[in-house]
Structure formats: structure tokens, C-alpha cells
UniProtKB/Swiss-Prot annotation:
GO terms for molecular function: fimbrial usher porin activity. The keyword NAD does not apply. It comes from Escherichia coli. Residues 1-38 form the signal peptide. The gene is focD. It is a multi-pass membrane protein. Involved in the export and assembly of the F1C fimbriae subunits across the outer membrane. It is found in: Cell outer membrane. GO terms for biological process: pilus assembly. The keyword Acyltransferase does not apply. This is Outer membrane usher protein FocD.
């Protein structure tokens, strides 16, 4: 028997696997060290001690194990641990451990800055506020009643601090000290697509599009740029065009929980109509606020007769639980669940008595929690993607503030040379009646013909959640505008009406055509809203619609969508209806569709490994207003071990309508890989044939080189596990480390803990990782690095001899790569990640004579073996 990494005792008979390499993993029988160490209690002494003769007749054959009598499993040093404070996970970080004052155990050394970041109120702890922020202090000596427990096996540090010394922080709060601005890095995101279309007469047209998003991160600054290229060619023509879309520079202003943006951006559209602009903006960022304080939820007040447990439920789910002291209480950190639903509050007193009451509530977009302020300040010049509008300068400011009893006040101002607008509104949570908001905007505008107009616009929003029926009703806009009301974008037009396009022959004015047409004489008058039921357990019924009328004409925009989605076991089906009519459109579009999907797993055993298990059959039928009907049947699913190859095959028939009858067909493949995504497909309908293709991905340049990835999101995580090539990342389709051990997780959640785990089942036989899980908390737009401690090399069962005898049992063996282990009987020790040749140091006591070093050398063929054996002499 011998000891493996981390002081675990292993039996050489428990090793399994061949020496031929491959994917076989070694399995070890892990037994606690204490099982093999005799502990004898002397009647004459109160302390415990190890009797070495229990292990060997020769005491010199056993190392000094007295430290184990004190529970000291590790020597003092720095260890990466998961920190739990009052049973709540806080963070994962390196912590300095030193011997406790009684010399019996390892104690964490924490600075006042660290304790404050964890939620300890440094001003409530006597003397703590006078200490330098980086002073190393003992928790239980600084805070009366505080305790700690270090779980060496799971590398967890459990801390308890009396509530008296804790800050009043919301649930889910992560201190800004833990936010990671990431590393310096350059980013490139690309998305290329193309297709070739051939018609009945043999004509061919080619189209291509490329979007490039580039970026640079330095500290807390983020620079981004967005550019596109388009290409089209056919018989007798060819055209390609580069277009710059936007560029901006941004950073967080942590103290204000806001973001500063300079360059091309857009205004918030919650009070005034949103517009694109080039300038500067400072605006609140709700992502910096804990989840328990985002959105709107009511503040719950009450009185606890004694120490009681409070439980809050919504729609049958418990969303909050805590223990309350006697007296009045206030709860303002409930996680919002949807946009409403009655809250059932239960207080169970220590004597068994129970208080129960309901808090009905609903929310509309403008509602804020009590005491919460949300603002946005913008200034710059208007930007339009076309050539029909000017670029007038403006300044805009909006504000919302939550008041007690469910009230919210909000408003804003918009100032420009040709435009002035002011808004004032109020919102209210009315309990079982729902939530409502009402605001008014007064505007003064000067149009392109130099005419001046004054007008008002009134907006009413309503929301009611019917918990009993699972229905969420929203009347989003009844908005009424007087004839003289115009928006800021209306004043930017160069002409009063029309539509113009830029061609090779210059600007051409054309006649009105569907939604391309604009006419400032037909400004919006009134519009109304939406009815949106919520999801049920196995089905959803939805109905939504809108209606918009205009001054100066009886034409209207209309839209209606209705549908029913349901599932029976794993068979799903849906029935949907759509109606749309634009004011300048001659016809109304109406479409009715039916769709059913049946997975092949419906007929398979639950433990089936067939490739058809991830496949489904689908049938759909559509009917349009002008008589065209289409039927399609097909097959779709995923392949490969990570389900990262998707496929779809469809065949159908179209009849009626303007184009007569024809057969249709469609086939496609979509691949998601660690280095990018690729797609290809073919379709035919009537006399047209189309071949299309696409390629997308990202490139990240950092201090350690270039790493390819799937398309990049706003916030990224760079996985760094040197030498651990081709290792999968858990819960990431198609993402695995490259040949160097690097990978990019293309998406991460801002200001929240992101857990990144490596799939150890995909590790190579010559790779060991100390920490398979890393947690990071990135700021917006950051590229944060998740570092893993890897040991790459040979797994060795080494027999260490000294002066012809095995080194003492329990000796600590340390390799040059930082790995350590404990020698078992016969001087055997298991070490991983070892080079073919090197040196190890051995220590079995506190004296200078109680240590030695050993050189070893393995044959080259050991690199391909699961476990190698070697004997080394220690001097």
C-alpha cells in the first residue's frame, strides 16, 4: 500500500488498467489515513499521541506523525478554497493559512478588506476600522463569537459571523471587490453567409454577407467596432459594399452602478422613443444590482411576535425563506418572478402558531422597487442608417424612482434645436387590481417645411396577473397623441414625405411602397395593446395584437397573433394564426398553420444509445388567405457525442395561390465546434434552386497567444489549462480546449458568479488537474481568465530507498512540479504529472537530518503507459 496525491492512502492491488494508454482511467480505493494510524490514549496523559510501534517495530521506519494528533492535515501555506459565510457560498479564492494560537489547527488569515467584501460590517467590529485594509487577522480573535472550519478534503472554508456584525446586504449580493475586469485582449467576431440561386431559365445570382465585430479590452475600458460587407452578382451586374455600422468606447462607473458610453449608442426607449446617436451616455445598469433587487417586487411589512421563520410562495413555489427576530420586519429583496402573481406569506412562530396573509401584486415596465433610482443621461447627434435624415444634436435625460406603498414616479426631458419634449408619469402597484402607469409627454417640433407644431401624447399601461388561471394580461399602450405631436426622429427628415434610395445613378425618389413610405402629414394618432396569457404546465394559449391609426388618413396598421401550443407526453403540437396589415399595403396577410413533432425516443427504451434517440419527425400544414396551401414532412435531430451536429431534411408540396402547384425540398447541416460554427444547405421550390452556406466564429488574442472560438458574446471566459488538450467544458456544446489547453466560453453573465468546470472524463491519461471547477465574476464586456492548475507528465509508483531501507512510513514526498504525496509502507509513493527524469525531496521530521533527495529516470516508453514503476535512492 502507498499514499497518493493529497495524502490519500492507496493499495497497489487496487490499481486497474493496462499499460497501453488509451482512454482507460485508473481507479483507486481511497481510504482515510487515520484508518492505518494507531491512536493510543495513555492513562497517565490527557493528550493523544501516535504509537509508532503500532506500525513498525523500528520507530525510525515511521515519520513524525504527531501533527495528526492535533488534526493538522496540511502544513501552513496558501490554499485555494471555496468560502462559505453563514452557510452561503461567497467566492473561491486563495487564502493564507497559519497555525492557530493554540497550535492545534490551521486558521485562515483574513484581511479587514476581505472580510468587508464578504459582508462583514467593519464599523460594527471594535477596532477593525482602524486596521490597515491588508492586515492579516484571525477571524475568531477579531470578531467575538465567530468560528471557522477548514474542510481539507473538499477544500472548503466555513465561516460563521454573528448577525450583529454583518452588513445589511441583499440576497445574491456580490461585492464589487470580487468583480473581475479581466485581461488585456483583442477580439474579432466574424459571421459570413452566402447563397447561390438558380431560376427556371438558367439564370444564376450570387449573394454574400460578412459582419465583422472587433474589440479591445484594456483594464476596465472596452473599445468595440462593427462593420459589414455585402456582395451581389448576377447576369450583367456585380456589386459589393463596405458599411461602417458603429464604434464605441465604454466602461463601468462602479460607485454609481452605471455605465459610461462614448461613441455610437442608442437612447433608452422606456420613456421617449429610442434613437441611435453618436455622443456620450451615462446610464444605470441593473445588471450591477443583485437579482433580489432587480425588477419590481413589493416590499413586505409585518410584525413577528417572536423568533419566527418566514416563507413566501408564488404560484406554488417557495421563492423566499428566512428567520426573523421578534418585532416589526421589512423584506425588500424578493426575487421577482415574472411580472406579477400573488405572494403567500407564512410566519411560523417558535410556539407553533402561524400567521398567513397574501400580498397581491403586478408590475409594469416603469415600476421600481422602493428607494431604487434608475436614470439615463445622453447627449450627441442623431444617427440614421439611411440618407433621408439629417443629424441634429440633442440632449436627453430620464429618471425613475420607487416610492413607498408601490408608487413610482418617472419623467424626462429632451432638448434639441428643432425639438423640445417633457414627460411626467406615475406608476402604481394596486394589489389584486393589477399594476398601472400613466404618463404624458408634451412636445414642440419644427418640421422640414419649417412649420411649428405643439402636441401631447398620453400613454396608459396596465398589467394584471391572474394566478388562479395562469394568465398575464397586458394592455400595452393605449397611447393617444394629438395632431400636433411629433417625435424627435420626425424632425430629422429632410423632406415631408416620400422615400428615396441611393443607386449607381444617384438618389431616386420613388412612389409609396408598403412600410418604406413615410409622410409627416400622417403622424400617429392612437394605438392599443396586447393580451398575453402565461404558460401552463403542458400547454400555452396566447393572443396578442396591436392597432395603430394616423392623423390625416383612415388607414391603419393591424396585427394579430393567436396560438395554442401543447404536449402529450413527449409529443408536441401547435396551432397558430397570424394577421397583418400595413397602412400602405393593399392586402391583408392571413396565415393559419398546424405543426406536430414526435421524437423517435417515444418508441425507445430510456437507456437506448441509438443515434435515432436524438431525432424527431415533424409535419406541418399552412394555409394563406389567397388560397395557397403548403404541406411539409421531415426529419431533424442531432449527431455526435456532444450533439453539436444538427441536421434537418424536409419534403413538401405547395398548391394554389399565385404561383400554382410545386414540390418543395430542404436539407441542411449545422455544426458547432470549438473553433467556430459552420452550416450548409440546399432547397428547391417551383423553378428555383438554392445552395447556401455559412461560417461564423471568433478569434481572441491575449498574452498567451491566439485562441479560436464559437461566435463571441459581449462577455467571455478564457479557459487556461496548460497541457490539457482536447478537454471538454461542461455544459458547453462543442467547446473543448485546443492543443495548448486553451478554450473560450463565448458567453458569460455580467456581475454574477459563473461556474466553469472541466469534464475530467475527457482528460488525457498523462494530465492531472488540481482544481476542476473555477468560479469567476466578470464585469460587462470583460475577458476573464479561468486558470486551472495542471500537471502534465507520467504517473509513477516510486519506491524510495535510503541506506538500503525504505524511507519512513508517512514521509512527505514533494516533486519539482509542486505535487506532493505521502509514502506508504515499503517506501512506495504515487506521483502524477512527473517528467521522465527529475528529482524529489523527502521529509519525515523536523530535524535537518530527517530529509533527503532522490534522483530518478524513466525509460521513454513510460510516456505512453498508464502507470510506471521506478526505484530511486534517497541521499
Amino acid at each position: 500500500m502507498f499514499f497518493g496525491d493529497g495524502g490519500q492512502l492507496l493499495s497497489d492491488k487496487s490499481l486497474t488498467g493496462s499499460a497501453g494508454g488509451g482512454n482507460n482511467r485508473m481507479k483507486f480505493n481511497i481510504l482515510p489515513l487515520a484508518f492505518f494510524i494507531g491512536i493510543i490514549v495513555s492513562p497517565a496523559r490527557a493528550e493523544l499521541y501516535f504509537n509508532r510501534r503500532f506500525l513498525s517495530d523500528d520507530p525510525d521506519a515511521v515519520a513524525d506523525l504527531s501533527a495528526f494528533t492535533q488534526g493538522q492535515e496540511l502544513p501552513p501555506g496558501v490554499y485555494r478554497v471555496d468560502i462559505y459565510l453563514n452557510d452561503t457560498y461567497i467566492s473561491t479564492r486563495d487564502v493564507q493559512f497559519q497555525m492557530s494560537q493554540d497550535g492545534k489547527q490551521l486558521a485562515p488569515c483574513l484581511s479587514p478588506e476581505h472580510m468587508s467584501a464578504m459582508g462583514v460590517n467593519r464599523y460594527a467590529v471594535p477596532g477593525m476600522e482602524r486596521l490597515p485594509a491588508d492586515t492579516c487577522t484571525s477571524l475568531n480573535s477579531m470578531i467575538q463569537g465567530a468560528t471557522f472550519r477548514f474542510d481539507v478534503g473538499q477544500q472548503r472554508l466555513y465561516l460563521t459571523v454573528p448577525q450583529l456584525y454583518m452588513s445589511n446586504q441583499a440576497r445574491g449580493y456580490i461585492a464589487p471587490e470580487y468583480w473581475d475586469n479581466g485581461i488585456t485582449a483583442a477580439l474579432l467576431n466574424y459571421d459570413f453567409s452566402g447563397n447561390r440561386v438558380r431560376d427556371t431559365y438558367g439564370g444564376t445570382s450570387d449573394y454574400a454577407y460578412l459582419n465583422l465585430k472587433t474589440g479591445l479590452n484594456i483594464g476596465s475600458w472596452r473599445l468595440r467596432d462593427n462593420t459589414s460587407w455585402s456582395y451581389s452578382a448576377g447576369k450583367g451586374y456585380s456589386q459589393n459594399n463596405w458599411q461602417h455600422i458603429n464604434t464605441w468606447l465604454e466602461r463601468d462607473i462602479v460607485s454609481l452602478r452605471s455605465r459610461l458610453t462614448m461613441g455610437d449608442s442608442y437612447t433608452r426607449g422606456d420613456i421617449f422613443d429610442g434613437v441611435n446617436f453618436r455622443g456620450i451616455q451615462l446610464a444605470s445598469d441593473d445588471n450591477m444590482v443583485p437579482d433580489s433587487q432587480r425588477g419590481y417586487a413589493p416590499t413586505i411589512h409585518g410584525i413577528s411576535r417572536g423568533t419566527s421563520r418566514i416563507s413566501i410562495r408564488q404560484n406554488g413555489y417557495e421563492i423566499y425563506q428566512s428567520t426573523l427576530p421578534p418585532g416589526p420586519f421589512e423584506i425588500n429583496d424578493i426575487y421577482p418572478a415574472g411580472s406579477g402573481g400573488d405572494l403567500q406569506v407564512t410566519l411560523q412562530e417558535a410556539d407553533g402558531s402561524v400567521q398567513r396573509f397574501n400580498v397581491p401584486w403586478s408590475s409594469v415596465p416603469v415600476l421600481q422597487r422602493e428607494g431604487h433610482l434608475k436614470y439615463a443621461l445622453s447627449a450627441g447627434e442623431f444617427r440614421s442608417g439611411g440618407h433621408q435624415q439629417d443629424n441634429p444634436r440633442f440632449a436627453e435625460g430620464t429618471l425613475k424612482y420607487g416610492l413607498p406603498d408601490g408608487w413610482t414616479v418617472y419623467g424626462g426631458a429632451w432638448i434639441a434645436e428643432r425639438y423640445r419634449a417633457f414627460n411626467l408619469g406615475v406608476g402604481k402597484n394596486m394589489g389584486w387590481l393589477g399594476a398601472v402607469s400613466l404618463d404624458a409627454t408634451r412636445a414642440n417640433a419644427r418640421l422640414p417645411d419649417e412649420s411649428r407644431h405643439d402636441g401631447q401624447s398620453y400613454r396608459f399601461l396596465y398589467n394584471k396577473s391572474l394566478t388562479e388561471t395562469g394568465t398575464n394580461i397586458q394592455l400595452i399602450g393605449y397611447r393617444y397623441s394629438t395632431r400636433g405631436y411629433f417625435t424627435f426622429a420626425d424632425t430629422a427628415w429632410k423632406k415631408m414625405s416620400g422615400y428615396s434610395v441611393l443607386t449607381q445613378d444617384g438618389v431616386i425618389q420613388i412612389q409609396p411602397k408598403y412600410t418604406d413610405y413615410y409622410n409627416l402629414a400622417y403622424n400617429k394618432r392612437e394605438g392599443a395593446g396586447e393580451y398575453q396569457p402565461a404558460d401552463g404546465e403542458s400547454s400555452t394559449l396566447y393572443l396578442s395584437g396591436s392597432h395603430q391609426s394616423y392623423w390625416g388618413t383612415d388607414r391603419t396598421d393591424r396585427q394579430l397573433n393567436a396560438g395554442f401550443n401543447s404536449s402529450v407526453n413527449d409529443i408536441s403540437w401547435s396551432l397558430n394564426y397570424s394577421l397583418s396589415r400595413n397602412a400602405w399595403q393593399h392586402e391583408t396577410d392571413r396565415i393559419l398553420s398546424f405543426d406536430v413533432s414526435i421524437p423517435f425516443s417515444h418508441w425507445m427504451r430510456s437507456d437506448s444509445t441509438s443515434a435515432w434517440r436524438n431525432a424527431s419527425a415533424r409535419y406541418s400544414q399552412t394555409l394563406e388567405a389567397h388560397g395557397q396551401a403548403a404541406s411539409t414532412a421531415g426529419l431533424y435531430g442531432t449527431l455526435l457525442g456532444d450533439n453539436n451536429l444538427g441536421y434537418s431534411i424536409q419534403s413538401g408540396y405547395t398548391r394554389g395561390g399565385y404561383e400554382g402547384s410545386s414540390k418543395t425540398g430542404y436539407a441542411s447541416l449545422n455544426y458547432r465546434g470549438g473553433y467556430g460554427n459552420a452550416s450548409a444547405g440546399y432547397s428547391h421550390s417551383g423553378g428555383y434552386r438554392q445552395l447556401y452556406y455559412g461560417l461564423s466564429g471568433g478569434i481572441l488574442a491575449h498574452a498567451n497567444g491566439l485562441t479560436l472560438s464559437q461566435p463571441l458574446g459581449d462577455t467571455l471566459i478564457l479557459v487556461r489549462a496548460p497541457g490539457a488538450s482536447d478537454t471538454r467544458i461542461e455544459n458547453q456544446t462543442g467547446v473543448s480546449t485546443d492543443w495548448r489547453g486553451y478554450a473560450v466560453l463565448p458567453y458569460a453573465t455580467d456581475y454574477r458568479e459563473n461556474r466553469v468546470a472541466l469534464d475530467t472524463n475527457t482528460l488525457a491519461d498523462n494530465v492531472d488537474i488540481e482544481n476542476t471547477v473555477v468560479s469567476v465574476v466578470p464585469t460587462h464586456g470583460a475577458v476573464v481568465r479561468a486558470d486551472y492548475k495542471t500537471r502534465v507528465g507520467v504517473k509513477v509508483l516510486m519506491t524510495l530507498m535510503r541506506n538500503g531501507k525504505a524511507v519512513p512510513f508517512g514521509s512527505v514526498v514533494t516533486a519539482r512540479n509542486g505535487g506532493s504525496s505521502i509514502a506508504g509502507e515499503n517506501g512506495q509513493v504515487y506521483l502524477s504529472g512527473m517528467p521522465l527524469s527529475g528529482q524529489v525531496s523527502v521529509k519525515w521530521g523536523s530535524q535537518t537530518t530527517d530529509q533527503c533527495t532522490a534522483d530518478y529516470k524513466l525509460p521513454k516508453e513510460s510516456a505512453g503507459q498508464i502507470l510506471s514503476h521506478v526505484t530511486a535512492s534517497c541521499r
